[in-house]
């Protein structure tokens, strides 16, 4: 699928113009240009990316450990609930992308980030009070992960592309996406274990942590949208 997409979709007009102007062949290393000229863009991108890594690792990774160790659910049932949520998420990713094209990438991403941060509270509450019901456990994971997280994941790549000009876009997006990715992936599950031990098995501290990440990402996404709109207005073609 990736090969088909890559060979059938043309480069953007912006990139083709940069290539024709010789900007893509300049000798300055793109990573030097990005770090020197776009530090705020990098910070905003990393801030926006935070909820992606945090929320996924809490709901799709740590929740399995929580269900098995704290609620004594079988590992098979916990994995089944997460796999069901991941499968259900696919059409909602497409819907989120469509909504982002219509209403603005930053708006949809920011609202979805806030929804993720808020939904984690009832999600863990429902897991705690499920009584071992697979239906309730599946519901507790599927709604936040399949619907709200899809609103983050769907417009994410397009949102980050708004941060950098064509000549350094690939490098800029790589920094924004990969740097917080490997940090969060390694830290969040262990941090959640520590937080839940501190609170004697209660996931409230974890929910607060997710909410802080969500607020940070929402602020960053709304700021990216506002900056993009100002730049588009200055160019005479605002894109809401």
Go through each PLM region and give its residues:
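A membrane-interface helix-boundary motif in multi-pass transporters
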Residues: 194-212
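Flexible cytoplasmic inter-helical loops of multi-pass small-molecule transporters
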Residues: 7-30, 233-237
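Helix-to-loop junctions at the C-terminal end of transmembrane segments
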Residues: 93-105
């Amino acid at each position: 699928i990736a090969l088909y997409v890559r060979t059938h979709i043309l480069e953007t007009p912006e990139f083709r113009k940069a290539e024709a102007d010789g900007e893509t062949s300049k000798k300055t290393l793109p990573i030097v240009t990005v770090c020197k000229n776009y530090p705020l863009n990098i910070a905003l991108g990393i801030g926006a990316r935070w909820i992606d890594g945090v929320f996924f690792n809490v709901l799709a990774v740590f929740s399995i450990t929580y269900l098995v160790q704290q609620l004594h659910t079988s590992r098979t049932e916990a994995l089944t609930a997460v796999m069901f949520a991941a499968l259900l998420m696919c059409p909602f990713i497409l819907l989120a992308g469509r909504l982002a094209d219509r209403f603005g990438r930053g708006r949809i991403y920011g609202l979805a980030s806030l929804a993720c941060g808020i939904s984690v509270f009832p999600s863990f509450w429902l897991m705690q009070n499920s009584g071992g019901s697979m239906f309730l456990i599946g519901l507790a994971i599927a709604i936040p992960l399949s619907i709200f997280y899809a609103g983050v994941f769907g417009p994410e790549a397009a949102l980050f592309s708004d941060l950098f000009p064509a000549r350094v876009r690939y490098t800029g997006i790589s920094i924004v996406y990969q740097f917080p990715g490997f940090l969060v992936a390694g830290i969040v599950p262990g941090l959640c274990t520590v937080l839940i031990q501190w609170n004697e098995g209660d996931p409230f501290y974890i929910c607060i942590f997710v909410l802080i990440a969500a607020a940070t990402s929402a602020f960053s996404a709304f700021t990216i949208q506002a900056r993009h709109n100002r730049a588009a207005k200055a160019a005479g073609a605002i894109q809401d």
